[in-house]
Amino acid sequence: MSRTPLIAGNWKMVLDHQQGTLLVQKLDWTLKDAKHDYSAVEVAVLPSHTSLRTVQTLIEGDKLSIALGAQDVSEHDSGAYTGEVSAAMLAKLGVTYVAVGHSERRQYHGETDATVRAKAAKALAAGLTPIVCVGEALEIRKAEQHVEFTVGQVTQALTGLTAEQAAGLVLAYEPVWAIGTGEVATPEDAQEVCAALREAVAELFDRATADAVRVLYGGSVKPASIAAIMRQPDVDGALVGGASTDAGDFAAIVRFRDHPA
């Protein structure tokens, strides 16, 4: 099955709404100059919640082909949950994608696999596409338990979903030891885990569902490393962190097919 690559930029807590607007404008100009085909490689940006409305207004007003994503979503529908943002609220803002279970949410906010499962379910129910993030810490990698660990995370996150729901989400493998450290998993490392995650989906549901799910790699993705990573058969895109806050770098990652083999 042919899966459309997705390059998603997670801005984290780096850009404010003004900086985000400028970045999206520069990104759009750069990709237009390159005659980028968004149907061949999809592009999404994930601003912080305070920038969503501003970026959404720009995307809709200028009819840009860049998709809008959010960095988190509540596991609750509505009510007295101070600081939370529901899936329905994000959907009303024109959000398409939402990251759930990012390693920084797990590390700093104590999110568990059960939390991730609940958030993914709420996102799907609201018509959003959750980007379910999984990944291992350095000690797990050194113990050679990384495949077992990440497969376990995916199994926990997807348990209770239907095959149709599972086919409508995106998985992202982010080796925690390679996030913000400058360390990059080799293309072979990325392929090993991404293939294992796809097999886990096949075991949970069926082969057709596994073939439909896009699996991204995230972990210090740079323009210099993206082409080799994207040549792997089970890697369908990238969840880009720091490099996504620079329009030139992010555009170069989006244009990975222009890079020499």
Curated annotation (Swiss-Prot):
It holds the Pfam family TIM. Pathway: Carbohydrate biosynthesis; gluconeogenesis; Carbohydrate degradation; glycolysis; D-glyceraldehyde 3-phosphate from glycerone phosphate: step 1/1. It is found in: Cytoplasm. It is an enzyme of class 5 (isomerase). It catalyses: D-glyceraldehyde 3-phosphate = dihydroxyacetone phosphate. GO terms for cellular component: cytosol. Substrate binds at residues 10-12, 180, 220, 241-242. GO terms for biological process: gluconeogenesis; glyceraldehyde-3-phosphate biosynthetic process; glycerol catabolic process; glycolytic process. Its main location: cytoplasm. Its EC number is 5.3.1.1. It comes from the Bacteria. The keyword Cytoplasm applies. Keywords: Cytoplasm, Gluconeogenesis, Glycolysis, Isomerase. SUPFAM superfamilies: Triosephosphate isomerase (TIM). GO terms for molecular function: triose-phosphate isomerase activity. HAMAP family: TIM_B. This is Triosephosphate isomerase. It comes from Kineococcus radiotolerans (strain ATCC BAA-149 / DSM 14245 / SRS30216). The gene is tpiA.
